[in-house]
């Protein structure tokens, strides 16, 4: 059985992320979305909110589960008996950074990374950009799953 992890902060999860999850789920028996905790960052959504939003947005993927993690992603992979890391790439800049990380993960732990080129319709989408556009009153319905859009709108209204 082959399994892979899709790591990230997912603050919040976007349709670009969902596209990568769907494509990874078609290639591996099991996908674990690892919502990684960075103690140096405070996100808009709590860890539990991010997990719930991903779960709600991926109910159509029976071989996908969502967990939290922190520390080295290679430790997360090994602890769960997974075999690979899957990362989405939007731009050449993403590739340069992710290639370095992939080479380090291979060197340190022998774990391979598989890159998925983001669909052109999502190549410009990022969590940060979606939040920024939403904060300025823009329409982000084409960037986010419906549940995420609803929760983001509510969270921005709470903040005033």
Swiss-Prot record:
It is found in: Cytoplasm. This is Phosphopantetheine adenylyltransferase. It comes from Mycolicibacterium gilvum (strain PYR-GCK). PANTHER family: PHOSPHOPANTETHEINE ADENYLYLTRANSFERASE. It is an enzyme of class 2 (transferase). GO terms for biological process: coenzyme A biosynthetic process. Belongs to the bacterial CoaD family. It holds the Pfam family CTP_transf_like. The keyword Hydrolase does not apply. Reversibly transfers an adenylyl group from ATP to 4'-phosphopantetheine, yielding dephospho-CoA (dPCoA) and pyrophosphate. Homohexamer.
